[in-house]
Amino acid sequence: MASPGYRRLLAAALLPWCCAAWALGHLDPPSPPPLVIWHGMGDSCCNPMSMGSIKKMVEKEIPGIYVLSLEIGKNMVEDVENSFFLNVNLQVGMACQILEKDPKLQHGYNAIGFSQGGQFLRAVAQRCPTPPMMTLISVGGQHQGVFGLPRCPGESSHICDFIRKSLNAGAYSKVVQERLVQAQYWHDPIKEEVYRNCSIFLADINQERHINESYKENLMALKKFVMVKFFNDSIVDPVDSEWFGFYRSGQAKETIPLQETTLYTEDRLGLKKMDKAGKLVFLAKEGDHLQISKEWFTAHIIPFLK
């Protein structure tokens, strides 16, 4: 029969293991990855009819998730104005600072960009690897740019009228490039050399002047890059840009898919390697620009956020 001293020694030795086993059995479930959202042209971070609604939907579908909807400016009015008139490179820099300072994002986050917010968040992924972006979802983003005049009916229609006139007057002039957001991803397939030399944003993040290896490495670090294309899009021209396709160089009628572009065949951004590794996801949806139902969003987007 064991002595009292031996029993006490055995109990002392087993106690930490018992406590550890009990603790492991009562661990809280891991928190879902945080989510960062960037709105599109003429929208704001917190519009209850758009990004505010998306934020609430995600929070309902994924309990406990932290959602940050980026506000570029001091308030919603500035946020809307900046989506038209603040240099995109400055906007991306501001977004990077916001993300870097947020303690809830330091272990990584997922991101959803709506319309132009899609290519803006891709720029964040390429330029600012800290904190790390895990999955990027681009909903109607224009990753090869646009070559069509923007249409935005409603309250912003007068601004779009001004944008059309400015782009017609000279999309690649220095003053238009520096002061008009949409000019900074204007891609003229008939004037490719002018575009490459004068585009202050898109030509840079698409590696069309020179190769920045860090851009490539940072984008390839994504777990998934999801692109949503709208078949009946009346805003984005060409719509293939939403899947990284574009017009064949030298004309503006025939479009080619991503896999036939120089960007892909020369793998200037790492997209070819990502495609082969199964990291690129192409989703298609009937309907016009950003026309998304709650049911579609829940079925096709929410699974990437868990």
From Swiss-Prot:
It is found in: Lysosome; Secreted; Golgi apparatus; Endoplasmic reticulum. Keywords: Disulfide bond, Endoplasmic reticulum, Glycoprotein, Golgi apparatus, Hydrolase, Lysosome, Secreted, Signal. The active site is at 115, 233, 289. It comes from the Eukaryota. Residues 1-27 form the signal peptide. Glycosylated. GO terms for biological process: adult locomotory behavior; associative learning; brain development; endocytosis; grooming behavior; lipid catabolic process; lysosomal lumen acidification; lysosome organization. Disulfide bonds join 45-46, 96-128, 152-160. The keyword Signal applies. The keyword Signal applies. InterPro entries: AB_hydrolase_fold, Palm_thioest. It catalyses: S-hexadecanoyl-L-cysteinyl-[protein] + H2O = L-cysteinyl-[protein] + hexadecanoate + H(+); hexadecanoyl-CoA + H2O = hexadecanoate + CoA + H(+); S-hexadecanoyl-N-acetylcysteamine + H2O = N-acetylcysteamine + hexadecanoate + H(+); S-hexadecanoyl-N-acetylcysteine methyl ester + H2O = N-acetylcysteine methyl ester + hexadecanoate + H(+). One of its GO terms (cellular component) is membrane raft. Glycans are attached at residues 197, 212, 232. It holds the Pfam family Palm_thioest. Highest amounts in brain, testis, lung, and spleen. Lowest amounts in liver and skeletal muscle. It is an enzyme of class 3 (hydrolase). Belongs to the palmitoyl-protein thioesterase family. Has thioesterase activity against fatty acid thioesters with 14-18 carbons, including palmitoyl-CoA, S-palmitoyl-N-acetylcysteamine, and palmitoylated proteins. In contrast to PPT2, PPT1 can hydrolyze palmitoylated proteins and palmitoylcysteine. Interacts with CLN5, ATP5F1A and ATP5F1B. This is Palmitoyl-protein thioesterase 1. It comes from Rattus norvegicus (Rat).
